[in-house]
Amino acid sequence: EQVLFEVQRYSLTVASELRPGARPNDAQASVSLLLEGRSVLPGSPVQRARLQFVDGAGGQRGARLADDGALLVINYPLALLPAIRQMLDSPGTDYVQGRFYGNGLIWADLHSAPVPAAD
């Protein structure tokens, strides 16, 4: 199965959470981007992706479909947030892609359309 959509808008969310019964210094913060657009593949229900950013090497999960297959969730290291924001804010078209193979392999990415080389 393949998911491919053109990014038309995005929103940044910075959140903080303190679970019931936790100590005040156990609050956790998160950063995510919600990307929305239009599918490039006929019949694909996925037109949104949530990029979740994780601080440090631990805690990374593989890409997955959520919300009954309508949302692609991709995890990236927090260090990539500035590069991804720059990519989204630059002129040109950006795409989100997800590929789910029968052997269990999952590939997901955010990429830009080819840019002509300067002469």
Regions found by a protein language model. Name each.
Residues 1-14, 64-69, 113-119:
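Surface-exposed beta-loop interaction hotspot
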